[in-house]
């Protein structure tokens, strides 16, 4: 299955809420949800009541789209979550939050998860001093994520550094603005994850 390459705004309209796929644009009146808050397509304005399965499926799709993950990988994360101790749904969100591209976004060094994924792929970040260009890399407590030294002076990273200065960060991440680096000081708890995801519906869907 290929990665989605269409218009990001269509995904937000499909889910009926902002997925913040375009960074700051999503907070302005240019946002597609603000202008056309209904699903795309000929029958988008005709809302119909979803079945139980439909609600579960929509919640799973929404979570996938927040993090930019394909179905196969998302299911593997769910299987990992099942094997971990604790509540499966919360384990799943914890795994998703631990992806390197998400951590870069949470640090404020990318305006969206999509941009974070591109920056990681292009080799602009290190983990514990070693270059890592795999967006799905799962960070651990104690890991230090930093902008590669050669990349710090690039116009893009300097722009993102300024952007990061005004961004709130979750308490499980420490951020050093001068070094353009962050440290994972704890695993994210459910209350640290500010996304409107009903993970229990995803668990119900995959448990059938």
Curated annotation (Swiss-Prot):
PROSITE patterns: RIBOSOMAL_S4, S4. Keywords: Ribonucleoprotein, Ribosomal protein, RNA-binding, rRNA-binding. Residues 98-178 form the S4 RNA-binding domain. Disulfide bonds: none annotated. The keyword Lyase does not apply. InterPro entries: Ribosomal_uS4 (IPR022801), Ribosomal_uS4_bac-type (IPR005709), Ribosomal_uS4_CS (IPR018079), Ribosomal_uS4_N (IPR001912), S4_RNA-bd (IPR002942), S4_RNA-bd_sf (IPR036986). It comes from the Bacteria. Signal peptide: none annotated. One of its GO terms (molecular function) is rRNA binding. GO terms for biological process: ribosomal small subunit biogenesis; translation. PANTHER family: 30S 40S RIBOSOMAL PROTEIN (PTHR11831), SMALL RIBOSOMAL SUBUNIT PROTEIN US4M (PTHR11831:SF4). HAMAP family: Ribosomal_uS4_B. One of the primary rRNA binding proteins, it binds directly to 16S rRNA where it nucleates assembly of the body of the 30S subunit. With S5 and S12 plays an important role in translational accuracy. Part of the 30S ribosomal subunit. Contacts protein S5. The interaction surface between S4 and S5 is involved in control of translational fidelity. Belongs to the universal ribosomal protein uS4 family. This is Small ribosomal subunit protein uS4. It comes from Acetivibrio thermocellus (strain ATCC 27405 / DSM 1237 / JCM 9322 / NBRC 103400 / NCIMB 10682 / NRRL B-4536 / VPI 7372). The lineage of its organism: Bacteria, Bacillati, Bacillota, Clostridia, Eubacteriales. The gene is rpsD.
């Amino acid at each position: 299955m290929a990665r989605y390459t269409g218009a990001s705004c269509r995904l937000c309209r499909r889910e009926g809420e902002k997925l913040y796929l375009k960074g700051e644009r999503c907070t302005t009146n240019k946002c597609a949800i603000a202008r056309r808050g209904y699903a795309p397509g000929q029958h988008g304005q005709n809302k119909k009541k979803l079945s139980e399965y439909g609600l579960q499926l929509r919640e799973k799709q929404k979570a996938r789209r927040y993090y930019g993950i394909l179905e196969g990988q998302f299911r593997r994360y769910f299987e990992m979550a099942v094997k971990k101790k604790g509540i499966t749904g919360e384990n799943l969100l914890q795994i998703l939050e631990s992806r390197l591209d998400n951590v870069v976004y949470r640090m404020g060094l990318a305006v969206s998860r999509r941009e974070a994924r591109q920056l990681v792929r292009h080799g602009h970040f290190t983990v514990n001093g070693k270059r890592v260009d795999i967006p799905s890399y799962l960070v651990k407590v104690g890991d230090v994520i930093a902008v590669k030294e050669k990349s710090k002076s690039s116009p893009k990273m300097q722009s993102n550094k300024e952007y990061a200065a005004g961004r709130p960060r979750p308490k499980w991440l420490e951020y050093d603005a001068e070094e353009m680096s962050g440290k994972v000081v704890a695993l994210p708890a459910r209350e640290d994850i500010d996304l409107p995801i009903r993970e229990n519906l995803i668990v119900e869907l995959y448990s059938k």
